[in-house]
Amino acid sequence: MRCLPLLCALLWLLAGASARADCECLWQGSFTEVQAGTDLVVSAAVIAGKGNSIDLRVEHTLRGPTPEHDIRVWLKTGDYCRPEPQLFPAGSQWVMALQQIDEEVEGGFNPHTPNLSYGRVGDYSLSSCGGYWLSQHGNWVTGNLVEAPRWVREPKMTPVLLDLVADYVAGKVSAQALLQASREDPAARELLLDTRAFLREQN
């Protein structure tokens, strides 16, 4: 009888592992290939996280209607093809291409685990099947931006200005311009920026 609690715990763990089965999806492409098919592209900071959701404070809307309030983004739980919530800690900044949740799905909400859900209608979801998010530090972004290897979230690249990414989303520059910027020599670019700053001071 002493083994019974241990057996129950083992069965519970196995059931949990089954419930967390990995999703199956094909790689949809880098950010430049997938962002146009989403509802909202924003530069935002994570202000809170709970269960499989995070709350974002939008700092800049690259495409779509500018949210009037903070927005909630639903991430991985069960076999949903979304990234793990732990990837987006409070205080971190991101560029995200998001899909709005416009309908309820069967089994998407369990009242016994209200913080683990498919998501509420009107909120947003983030796909893991492509370059749907980019890491942002200040005014610079990195990630699977353009012509990057499949499933590689932080490929070797030179950080690209957020303004340039915004111009791409707005159709003002080409993907080739982003690719060129991501391959620039960081030292040469820093020298160019310093030179421009010096010339402005002289004027």
Where are these regions (language model features)?
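Short boundary/loop segments of OB/S1/cold-shock single-stranded nucleic-acid-binding domains
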Residues: 21-38
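Bacterial N-terminal signal peptides
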Residues: 5-15
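Structural detector for short beta-strands of small beta-barrel domains
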Residues: 37-61
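Netrin-like (NTR/C345C) domain of secreted extracellular proteins
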Residues: 81-203
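OB-fold (S1/OB) nucleic-acid-binding surfaces
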Residues: 52-76
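Bacterial Sec-dependent signal peptides at the C-terminal "C-region" and cleavage site
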Residues: 14-22
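Extracellular secreted precursors and ectodomains with disulfide-bonded cysteine-rich loops/domains
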Residues: 21-23, 79, 127
